[in-house]
A protein has these predicted regions:
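C-terminal motif of bacterial Sec signal peptides marking the signal peptidase cleavage site
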Residues: 15-17
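Bacterial Sec signal peptide processing site at the extreme N-terminus
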Residues: 19-32
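Hydrophobic beta-strand positions that form the internal "hydrophobic ladder"
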Residues: 73-74, 119, 183, 227, ...
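Residue-level detector of Asp-centered blade-edge/turn motifs that repeat once per structural unit
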Residues: 68-69, 114-115, 178-179, 222-223, ...
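Multi-bladed beta-propeller domains
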Residues: 39-60, 91-106, 154-170, 199-214, ...
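A flexible loop/linker signature enriched in serine peptidases of the S9 family
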Residues: 57-60, 77-87, 101-107, 122-150, ...
Length: 362
């Protein structure tokens, strides 16, 4: 789900097979965008970061995830002239940015396959070429759950597009186990927003969660044995009624999300944060015994999102970033030290979200 852009804007807004569209060339950088990456110094309190390298500058760029070889990133972006997100790849120096999605509809949540010969992502393009409508914010701060989202895989050059899911309702938020055997994703195929796994070809779908409420944003642990995710399970009758009414309209209210973990087969579910805030984008640290995630827990206004780490036992919460705006979508490369995240810091245009690379310092 495309969280960053909705956060930033709000904070300060049946086919048997797929014909292969011709990949489009992304728009050229605007004159105000940096043509090459640039160094940015972290805040003095950000002691886990070496020098930051800003890989993008201009538009909205987020959810950047490493290839299995650790030499490329796949990410989603709304660049100049685009109405909504498409999927791009780039080298770790920010060069060779190429669009790999169709250029139609809205896309989200891309991830490399083992061997880096495929990329999985969600797209609405089968429902039409236009961007789907943004949420009606008269209902408050809400996220859209686009029923037109299905999962696809594509070659890194944008060819050989293949559909993986074809169920009624939302299928998105897919990532792949480091072991290379299963895709984990969020789906509404059974009437609620739950987490499922499947084989890399879309077969053998298994449901992992069944509690009322939203379960999503899943990632595997380094050994593939566990899954970390974000969740909101309403229990109060009014909260349940509100959740059900919004979901019927294709919306959810994400003001309170906690971080959970479970075994890769769905057993032993445990809540590991209790912050009463919007906590999301969890990712396992290389050791496998801590989680890094984004949350607005440190800001009474709920507008500033920073990165935090916490033990899988729920102990040892540590704040990592101190930017006054948005920091989110953290991920470690396979080498365990190269680190990527997305932020509003140091941008050329206020509110833009960009991709940053750094070396993690323990």
């Amino acid at each position: 789900m495309r969280l960053t852009l909705i956060l930033v804007t709000s904070i300060m807004t049946i086919v048997a097979g797929c014909a292969q569209p011709t990949p489009q060339t992304p728009p050229a950088p605007s004159p105000t965008s940096a043509a090459v990456p640039r160094a940015v110094q972290p805040d003095p309190q950000e002691t886990h970061f070496g020098e930051l390298v800003m890989l993008t500058d201009g538009g909205e760029n987020a959810e950047a995830y490493f290839s299995f070889a650790g030499d490329r990133l796949v990410y989603q972006a709304t660049k100049e002239g685009m109405g909504c997100d498409q999927i791009f790849t780039m080298k770790l120096d920010g060069t060779n940015q190429k669009m790999v999605s169709t250029g139609s509809g809205r896309t989200t949540c891309a991830y490399y396959y083992p061997g880096d010969d495929w990329i999985v992502y969600a797209s609405t393009h089968l429902a039409g070429p236009d961007c789907p409508p943004v949420p009606d914010h008269s209902k408050g701060y809400v996220w859209p759950i686009y029923a037109a989202y299905d999962l696809f895989k594509v070659r890194p050059d944008g060819t050989d597009l293949q559909q993986l899911t074809d169920s009624p309702g939302y299928d998105a938020e897919a990532t792949i186990s480091p072991v290379g055997d299963r895709i984990v994703f969020t789906s509404m195929r059974d009437g609620d927003l739950d987490i499922y796994t499947m084989n890399l070809d879309g077969s053998d779908v298994r449901r992992l969660t069944d509690a009322l409420g939203y379960d999503g944003g899943p990632f595997f642990s380094p050994d593939g044995a566990k899954i970390v995710y974000r969740a909101n399970h309403p229990t109060d009758p009014q909260e349940i009624a509100d959740y059900s009414a919004l979901l019927a309209d294709g919306l959810i209210r994400p003001s309170k999300l906690e971080i959970w973990i479970m075994n890769a087969d769905g057993s032993d579910k445990r809540q590991i944060t209790d912050l009463g805030a919007a906590s999301f984008a969890p990712f396992f640290m290389p050791s496998g015994d801590r989680i890094i995630f984004s949350s607005n827990t440190g800001d009474p206004s709920g507008r500033e999102f920073d990165l935090y780490t916490i033990g899988i036992d729920g102990e040892g919460l540590e704040r990592i970033t101190y930017s006054p705006e948005f920091d989110g979508f953290p991920m470690f490369a396979p080498d365990g030290t190269t680190f990527v995240f997305c932020s509003n810091r140091s941008n050329s245009t206020p509110g833009d979200t960009n991709v940053f690379l750094t070396r993690w310092i323990d």
